[in-house]
A protein has these predicted regions:
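Short, Lys/Arg-enriched segments at the junction into DNA-binding effector domains
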Residues: 2-3, 118-141
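N-terminal/domain-start alpha-helical segments
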Residues: 1-123
């Protein structure tokens, strides 16, 4: 199964993301802090994609990204954050993220971006974004 880690400290946003990714066929592991995310990745080495918020208590998403990249160059990383300044985007990509999505976001777009990372990671099966886009065509604020 396609396993994803979602790091988001706000429970309502995390729940929204998790519900939509599970509907799309993903096995989702949740974390609400940077430290917890790193622990979950160590316990689940088969995670192929990580969605990381930036603004977190303790270790921020940029540092989580750096630490992941120090030990795992193959995992796909998407920064998923409200920070939309160009410098934040550049920093995210320079620390090792493969993509950067700002809130509000479309769940259909997020699923398509996750699918793209799975395709690049080795041709694994992706979610049926065409079938679910009508259901997921809502924007989250």
């Amino acid at each position: 199964m396609k396993k994803i880690l979602v790091l988001e400290d706000e429970a309502s946003i995390r729940s929204f993301i998790v519900i939509n990714l599970r509907r799309a066929g993903y096995d989702v592991i949740e974390a609400e802090s940077g430290e917890e995310a790193l622990e979950r990745l160590r316990a689940n080495p088969d995670v192929k994609v990580a969605l990381l918020d930036i603004m977190l208590p303790g270790i921020d998403g940029f540092e989580v990204c750096r630490r992941i990249r120090a030990t795992n160059t193959k995992i796909g990383i998407i920064m998923l954050t409200a920070r939309s300044q160009e410098m934040d985007k550049v920093t995210g990509l320079m620390t090792g993220a493969d993509d950067y999505v700002t809130k509000p976001f479309s769940p259909a777009e997020l699923t398509a971006r996750v699918d793209a990372l799975f395709r690049r990671a080795g041709g694994e099966e992706t979610a049926q974004t065409g079938e679910i886009s009508a259901v997921l065509a809502v924007y989250f604020f």
